Amino acid sequence: MTASYEDYDTAIKAFWAGRDLQAQKQSESGKTDAGTRGSVTGGLHLSALQELIAREFLPLADLGATVRQSGIIPLPGYYRRAKNWDVVVTYNDILVAAIECKSQVGSFANNFNNRTEEAIGNAVDLWRAYEAGLLGKTRPWLGFVFVVEHAPGSTTIVRDQGKPLYSPDPVFDNSSYTRRYQILFDRLVRERLYDAACLISSAKGEGIYDEPLPEVSTRNLTAAITGRVAYIQGLA
C-alpha cells in the first residue's frame, strides 16, 4: 500500500482526536499531568500515524517479514542496552526499518532542545550498535516522522536567551522553531543519520497545515519507503 497525502491528513486529524481523548480520560480519572502532558502520556495519540506507516511495509509480509507498530519494540543500542521504536520491520536477520514518531504541541521553548537531542542521539546510538555487529549485516533503514503544532509559538522568530561563547551557525538567525525543525531534519537526512524524515505542521484539531520542506515531506517519506520495500524484495 502506498500512502497518499489524504491518508496522512486523516492520520493527523486522528492525532488531535487521540490527544483530546487521552486528556479527557485523565481528567475523568482525577490524575491530570501538568500542561499538555495529559494529552500524550496515554501513548496512543500517534497510533493512526504509526499504523499508516506500518501498512506501507505490508507488501513484505508476503515474503515472511514481520511488521510491528504496537506494544514494546526494543532494538539494541550501543551506549545503552536498548531503545523502543514506534514502527519496526524485520525480515530474517535484516532490520528492514525502524521509525520514530514524535510531536510537539506547545511548550516550544522548553522542549525543542529535548526533541533535537532525542532525534540525534537515537540515530547515533543505533548506527553505533550496527557497526558493533548487533543488528545484522545488512544496513538498517531509519525514518523519523515529526508533527509540530502550527501556532504563534512555533512560527514567530525565537528570542534566544544569552549569547553563546562562539558564533552559532547563521542559518539559525531570525528563525522560528518550525524553521529550526526544518534545518534539523534536512541535515539529519542529508548526513545519513536517517534515511528519510517527514516534518508536518498542523493547527490544533485540523489536518496537515503545511509541509514546510519538500525534502522532508510525506511524499518523500512514501517514496523512500517504497524504495526500501523494493530493495528488500530484490534481496528475497
What residue spans do the PLM features occupy?
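Interdomain/boundary linker segments immediately adjacent to catalytic/signaling cores
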Residues: M1-Q69, L75
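Phosphate/oxyanion-binding active-site loops and adjacent basic polyanion-contact surfaces
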Residues: G42-Q50, R80, N111, R115-E118
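Hydrophobic, Leu/Ile/Phe/Ala-enriched alpha-helical segments that form helix-helix packing faces
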Residues: L49-A61, A123-Y130, R180-R192, I225-Q233
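Low-complexity intrinsically disordered segments
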Residues: A54, L58, A203-A236
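Charged, often glycine-rich, active-site loop that binds/positions anionic groups
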Residues: G71-V87
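Active-site beta-strand-loop-beta-strand hairpin of nuclease catalytic cores
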Residues: V88-A98
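A short, flexible beta-alpha/helix-coil linker loop
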Residues: S103-S107
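Acidic, metal/cofactor-coordinating or nucleic-acid-engaging core segments within structured domains
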Residues: A109-D210, P214-E215, R219
